[in-house]
Amino acid sequence: MKKFVNIYTVLYLLVGILGTLVTVWFTPITVGPITIPPSSWLMGFSFLLITLIQDAYGSKVSERMIWILLAVTALICVLLNYTLMLVLASGIAFVVGQFTTKTLYTFGTSRTASSMVGSVVDVGIWVFLGLSPIGVGTVPWERFFQAVLGQVLVQLILQGIAGKVYDKYFK
């Protein structure tokens, strides 16, 4: 297997780690009828990055990167004494969302579309298990749908922009 440490894999790890940390460091922002969890600004990019890693190094390396990032973020959560539910929520949402993106992309769905679908799956699981009263409680039940909508909107907008920039300048 060829060496796979490059800008995409490093960014993938950084985005995932920072996305996990900002969840506890900052509270969600409410803008009108929607609530935007802090991880919204970062985690959407991990879905685009995993497709770039798959293009550059193949399916096995992209799978390995998903598991590496899961292990690193779980370790960080445990070391920082985050609640076990936050660790589990993060892990479950991340793995299901990333593998959804990877699988759709493998079967021919566009980079942007597969990333967006994976993000929606990730967000639903993450907000439900991690941010709601089941998890750390930063999103009360009455704001649940607004938080999912807020995170999905931010991630989809950012992914759409990033996908267009990538297609225009890096393809």
Predicted regions and their residues:
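Membrane-embedded alpha-helical hairpins and interfacial helices in multi-pass inner-membrane proteins
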Residues: 83-171
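Hydrophobic transmembrane alpha-helices
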Residues: 1-56, 60
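Alpha-helical transmembrane segments of multipass membrane proteins
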Residues: 17, 21, 51-52, 74, ...
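Residue-level recognition of pore/gate-forming positions within transmembrane alpha-helices
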Residues: 16, 69-73, 119
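Cytoplasmic-side transmembrane-helix entry/capping segments in multi-pass membrane proteins
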Residues: 7-9, 60-70, 110-113
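Interfacial aromatic-anchored transmembrane helix boundaries in multi-pass membrane proteins
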Residues: 23, 27, 32-36, 73-93
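Pore-lining transmembrane helices
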Residues: 47, 65, 150
